[in-house]
From Swiss-Prot:
Designated gene of the protein: RDS1
Sorted UniProt keywords: DNA-binding, Metal-binding, Nucleus, Transcription, Transcription regulation, Zinc
DNA-binding residues (ranges): 15-42
Top-level taxon of origin: Eukaryota
Function: Zinc cluster transcription factor involved in resistance to cycloheximide.
One Pfam short name: Zn_clus
Protein's UniProt name: Regulator of drug sensitivity 1
InterPro entries on file: OAF3, Zn2-C6_fun-type_DNA-bd_sf, Zn2Cys6_DnaBD
Subcellular location: Nucleus
Gene Ontology molecular function, alphabetical: DNA-binding transcription factor activity, RNA polymerase II-specific; sequence-specific DNA binding; zinc ion binding
One GO CC term, this protein: nucleus
Length: 832
């Protein structure tokens, strides 16, 4: 067979600087004119690199010529840069086998799902200490409730340590009220659900009815225009899934003005599907703007309630309109735009009860990703020769970028990074760069400086997403076992890219009077590009920092387990990765505390809260979990050291143990203050506005209380002690704990033994503790937390007992609802 001729890679003549900012290059050597004018270092791709690639291709023969584009050398790795890992001496490379499906499974009542590797529940199950604490609190709550239901009085009415119900009573009551109020909700949009469609016989009567409902909810024209402007200025810049000019044009043909200065919706049969698409988009846009407006602290509570009710009605109407369009049977770009905004509205809803990302939320996001691929959005639009209209090409491009930005913002840090999507993203980036080099039309569409900057923001975030996806994909694989140094190298690459393209220094700099770098969207909306850029810098940094924290944390736990039997080989790894995770936590916590305290000197506007705050609520839970993980180790280590000190005969040994106990006491106080500081900040800024924060803030105030009274260890051991001592835990409670947390109550002695054994934390030693204390003392966040906090966090809860809390919760026939919240089936419990 004749050898197949392999096409040689084309040498890119554009210099790297001009290519980066997407400007025309005159290709002069050794330095182009633009780089000379701006005193930039001008560099071109080397032919030697390309010739090496050609040689490799030639040697591969027939099979190589049939590889997909994304299997060739990635566009982001052509620079030839080599990253120094900077690992301490003694840290060894190792093959990692981290994940166990058992630790990601969740079974609560009638719900079963496999969580993502870095999701909150998976991380809790991955750590034996947090897992034991969560299972103990959950089990004791079920026991108390079971005893109450059976009329069994509390064994100890004067408990020295309060249970969690005293703290979370109000949150549970509000959750019960919420479950009653929203008992019937619209189903998640998906392949298997459709209430009605345009093909039904009663469509001619159904549509006017829906239109009348929309008109009834909409306000006067001037108020609607204010809400649209609010959406354009505060929401659209971060979710630019549509062309505002086209949307406004569609509105002019849809809306008529009646005599009462209100909008009247046209009911002409002509282009009815297009009108329903526009109407569904209008309803969800207005719902999001209303939700944004109700976060204004200066609004009267009655106005907030009306805005919330109107937003909920508009959201439900949008859902009905999307069902009418039958969006999964008749997919197109316009309905996909509506679906994206509907999803964002549900995700950002301050009244959502989710404390962490729910499986429903993530499953819906994957529906959207799959639908985008059904539409063929994963391929650069220029690859389709049948698309001639530049508006269609632009729309398809922004929709692909849109769904990927949602994955980046919402699910990437959870460990949702499939290789298939990463490959599509990278191939898309390669094709797009080739397109802009060959196309003059793209340059015309982004000729202004502001447009260039906006494009840089979007594409830099996309490139960072590609890099992080590869990193997360390597870390979460259950089939391939990566090498530690390979992971560390990818982390370094990701950190460097984030620091270069999203520097946090710009959001801490004082604002100076200068003309806004404006870009016009639609007829009359002007956006400040620098303002958008600074908000994106913050959002990108907290996502990237969360990814790094999750990876370092899990690697630390992995080597902690290894050190139980092989401490000589892996202790250096454990110390290095624990310190890396601790520093990553301090950095992320510092960013979030600075945001909550408005420390960015006006660089991030208060009106951005609707975009940012929901993500902050979720990330705070992750940070508090990390603090719990560290506090549990400090506390158990302290107990172990006290036992060693009391049993030591040698004076020198006693002095060593005493010194370590003192260090642990200081560290416990530091982390306690950091947790309490973030809890207080969240209480002040988020708790009243966000239902999720309303539930999580008091729960972690309870953890602060346990630290203050020295009860963290005893509460963690409590459930397991109760099983071991009297064995009176009801079988249904034991089963519930086993299914939700994967801990078999029959092994309660073994579970507790692992917690209290000095061998479990033998490498969590003084060397590491001193390094952690140094990190705390050099952290501005830690210093600020120590200054801000007092010891009075839990005083308001001291005057209510567990039994009184249950009495208050279960009055007014709340029994069924409360049991539902615990995730259990009422039929398995005794009746009152």
């Amino acid at each position: 067979m004749d050898s197949i001729t392999v096409k040689k890679p084309r040498l890119r003549l554009v210099c790297l600087q001009c290519k980066k900012i997407k400007r025309k290059c005159d290709k002069l050597r050794p330095a182009c004119s633009r780089c000379q004018q701006n005193s930039l270092q001008c560099e071109y791709e080397e032919r030697t690199d390309l010739s090496a690639n050609v040689a490799a291709n030639d040697s591969d023969g027939f099979n190589s010529s049939h590889k997909l584009n994304f299997e060739q050398q990635p566009v982001l790795e052509r620079t030839g840069l080599r990253y120094s890992l900077q690992v301490p001496e003694g840290v060894v490379n190792a093959t990692l086998s981290i994940w166990n499906a058992e630790d990601m499974l969740v079974i609560v009542g009638l719900v079963t799902f496999l969580d993502y590797p870095f999701a909150a529940h998976s991380l809790a199950q991955h750590d034996q200490y947090i897992r034991a604490l969560c299972a103990s609190l959950y089990g004791m709550a079920l026991v108390d409730f079971s005893n109450y239901a059976n009329g069994i009085p509390c064994e100890d009415t004067s408990r020295s340590i309060l249970g969690p119900l005293s703290f979370i009573e109000k949150a549970i009551f509000r959750r019960i009220e919420h479950s009653k109020q929203f008992r019937v909700q619209s189903a998640a949009l998906g392949l298997l659900y459709n209430a009605f469609s345009m093909e039904e016989e009663n469509f001619s009567t159904l549509l006017p009815s829906l239109i009348a409902e929309v008109e009834d909810v909409l306000m006067q024209k001037k108020d609607c225009e204010i809400l649209l402007r609010c959406f354009y200025q505060n929401i659209y810049p971060f979710y630019p899934f549509m062309d505002i000019s086209l949307f406004e044009s569609d509105l002019t043909s849809l809306l008529l003005q009646d005599d009462n200065n209100r909008w009247k919706i046209s009911t002409e049969v002509k282009n009815v599907r297009k009108k329903i698409e526009t109407l569904s988009l209008l309803t969800i846009v207005m719902a999001m703007a209303l939700m944004h407006s109700k976060l204004d602290a200066n609004l009267l509570s009655m106005v907030k309630e009306n805005a919330s009710e109107s937003a909920r009605k508009l959201s439900l109407l949008c859902h009905k309109l999307l069902c009418l369009l039958d969006v999964f049977r008749y997919p197109n770009e316009n309905t996909f735009t509506c679906l994206l905004y509907f999803y964002v509205s549900e995700h950002l809803d301050p009244e959502s009860p989710d404390c962490v990302l729910s499986p429903t939320n993530l499953l819906t996001l994957h529906h959207l990703l799959n639908l985008s691929m059904t539409l063929g959005l994963q391929y650069e639009p220029s690859k389709y020769k049948r698309f001639k209209d530049p508006e269609v090409i632009r729309q398809r491009r922004i929709l692909w970028l849109g769904v990927q930005s949602l994955l980046f913002q919402i699910s990437l840090a959870e460990g949702d990074a499939g290789k298939s999507n990463s490959e599509y993203m990278e191939a898309y980036l390669t094709d797009f760069e080739e397109y802009i080099e060959a196309s003059s039309e793209y340059e015309k569409s982004s000729a202004s400086e502001s447009n260039v900057q906006m494009n840089d923001i979007v594409w830099n975030k996309y490139k960072f997403h590609v890099i992080l996806s590869k990193l997360m994909s390597d870390c979460t694989s259950v089939i391939q076992h990566p090498q530690l140094f390979h992971i560390l190298g990818n982390i370094k690459r990701s950190e460097d890219f984030m620091a270069e393209n999203f520097p946090t220094s710009s959001i801490y700099q004082p604002l100076h009077e200068k003309e806004p770098n404006a870009i016009k969207v639609g007829k009359s909306t002007v956006l400040d590009v620098m303002d958008i850029q600074k908000t994106e810098i913050f959002l990108t940094n907290i996502v990237g920092s969360m990814c790094f924290l999750n990876i370092f944390d899990v690697l630390s736990l992995h080597f902690e387990k290894k050190c139980v039997m092989h401490w000589e080989e892996y202790e250096k790894n454990y110390h290095f990765l624990t310190l890396k995770s601790f520093n990553a936590y301090l950095k992320l916590a510092g960013l979030i505390s600075d945001y909550l305290e408005n420390k960015f000197q006006g660089n991030i506007l208060e009106s951005r809260g609707y975009i940012i705050d929901k993500q902050i609520c979720f990330m705070l839970v992750r940070i508090w979990m990390f603090q719990c993980r560290i506090l549990l180790r400090f506390s158990y280590k302290q107990e172990s050291q006290k036992k060693l000190a009391s049993s030591s005969i040698s004076t020198n040994d006693n002095e060593k143990e005493d010194e370590m106990i003192v260090i642990l006491e200081r560290l416990i106080k530091h982390i306690r203050n950091q947790m309490a500081h973030l809890v207080d900040l969240a209480k002040g800024k988020l708790q009243d506005s966000y239902f999720g924060a309303y539930q999580t803030v008091p729960m972690f105030r309870y953890v602060v209380y346990l630290i203050d009274v020295g009860g963290l260890v005893s509460v963690t051991n409590g459930f397991w002690d109760k099983i071991s001592s009297d064995g009176e835990i009801p079988p249904k409670v034991q089963q519930a704990v086993r299914l939700k947390w994967g801990l078999d109550c029959n092994n309660s002695r073994r579970i507790k033994q692992k917690l209290i054994s000095s061998q479990s934390l033998q490498s969590f030693n003084q060397v590491l503790l001193c390094q952690m204390e140094d990190a705390v003392l050099s952290s501005s966040f830690a210093i600020k937390a120590n200054t801000a906090m007092s010891q009075n966090t839990a005083e308001e809860f001291f005057n209510i007992s567990e039994e009184e809390a249950l009495n208050q919760l279960l009055e007014n026939n709340n029994f069924d609802a409360f049991w539902d919240l615990l995730g259990e089936n009422l039929s398995d419990m005794p009746s009152l």
